[in-house]
C-alpha cells in the first residue's frame, strides 16, 4: 500500500496524481499480458491510496522467494550497473535467467522510459527464484516520476 501526503498540499496533490498514474501503468501492463500486481486506487477527502496485492505471497501463509536485481547483479554480473535490461541480458547469457524474462525486463525498461519513470533503480525490479515464467515479475514503483 502506498498513500499520498494530505491532499490540498503541493506534495499531497502531486503524489495523488502519481499514484493514480502508477495504477494506470499497472492496468496497461496487465491488459497486455504482463504479470503485475492487482492494484486499485482509493480516494478520500484527505489522501489517495494505491492498494495492491503483493506478487510475492502465496495464500495467507506462504511467500515466493524473490531477490532484488541489485543483489543478483552484485553476485553474478561483473562491472557497474547500467540498467535492468543490460543486467538481465548478462544473466540470460550466463543461463541464469530465461531469455524471455530478459526480454520482458527490457520491455519494462522501455515502458518505464515511455511513461517518464526516472526511478528505475535496481531495487525496483526483483527476480522470482525457481519460476522461469515469472522470473522478472517483481516490479515496484512504476509511477512516472
Language-model features and meaning:
Residues 17-32, 82-145:
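Conserved kinase catalytic-core segment
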Residues 1-78:
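Conserved ATP-binding subdomain of kinase catalytic cores across diverse folds
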Amino acid at each position: 500500500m502506498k498513500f499520498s501526503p494530505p491532499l490540498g498540499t503541493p506534495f499531497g496533490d502531486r503524489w495523488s496524481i502519481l499514484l493514480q498514474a502508477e495504477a494506470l501503468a499497472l492496468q496497461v501492463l496487465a491488459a497486455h499480458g504482463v504479470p503485475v500486481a492487482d492494484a486499485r486506487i482509493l480516494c478520500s477527502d484527505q489522501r489517495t491510496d494505491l492498494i495492491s496485492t503483493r506478487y510475492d505471497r502465496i495464500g495467507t501463509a506462504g511467500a515466493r522467494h524473490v531477490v532484488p536485481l541489485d543483489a543478483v547483479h552484485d553476485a553474478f554480473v561483473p562491472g557497474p550497473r547500467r540498467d535492468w535490461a543490460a543486467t538481465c541480458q548478462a544473466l540470460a547469457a550466463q543461463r541464469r535467467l530465461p531469455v524471455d524474462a530478459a526480454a520482458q525486463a527490457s520491455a519494462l525498461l522501455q515502458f518505464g522510459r515511455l511513461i517518464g519513470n526516472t526511478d528505475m533503480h535496481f531495487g525496483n525490479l526483483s527476480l522470482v527464484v525457481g519460476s522461469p515464467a515469472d522470473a522478472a515479475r517483481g516490479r515496484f514503483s512504476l509511477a512516472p516520476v
